[in-house]
From Swiss-Prot:
Taxonomy, superkingdom: Bacteria
Family: Belongs to the methylglyoxal synthase family.
EC number(s) per entry: 4.2.3.3
Tagged with keyword Phosphoprotein: no
Organism, scientific name: Actinobacillus pleuropneumoniae serotype 5b (strain L20)
Known role: Catalyzes the formation of methylglyoxal from dihydroxyacetone phosphate.
Pfam families per the UniProt record, alphabetical: MGS
Protein name: Methylglyoxal synthase
Gene Ontology CC: one annotated term: cytosol
Coiled coil: none
Top EC group: lyase
Catalyses which reaction(s): dihydroxyacetone phosphate = methylglyoxal + phosphate
Entry keywords, A to Z: Lyase
Residue span(s) of domain MGS-like: 6-152
Amino acid sequence: MKTTIRKISARKSIALVAHDSCKQSLIQWTLQHKASLTPHTLYATGTTGHLLARESGLNIQALLSGPMGGDQQLGGLIAEKKIDILIFFWDPMNAAPHDPDVKALMRIATVWNIPVAINETSANFLLSAALFDQEIGINVPDYDGYLAERLA
């Protein structure tokens, strides 16, 4: 598929997600990085978002809970180019009833080429990257070209 360049502003839209067994770790991580996260627009799946907002005082737009459709809502926002970064503290040791939704979320994040952190260490690397607070361009699918080819 052909690609085009998508501009991501210095002020990012960041999705924060955590499986149940990882929620406290994400809360602690968010508290440690509150100053770095404050200038950005924050989204989260339902329970995680409400817990993060309560514990950190950050303004977080909480979507539905992951198993109730929140992962798919985030995937939709990624496809609409409204999410720039996904931080997902994922538990690889426990199956969740919405594992297919999680797989779909990861697939969409990969299709739209956004940075993804799946644990504390990768989130630390992402947050400390020189590009984190800069405007950048990323290659994304040329959906308009794709659609034009399909309709020709």
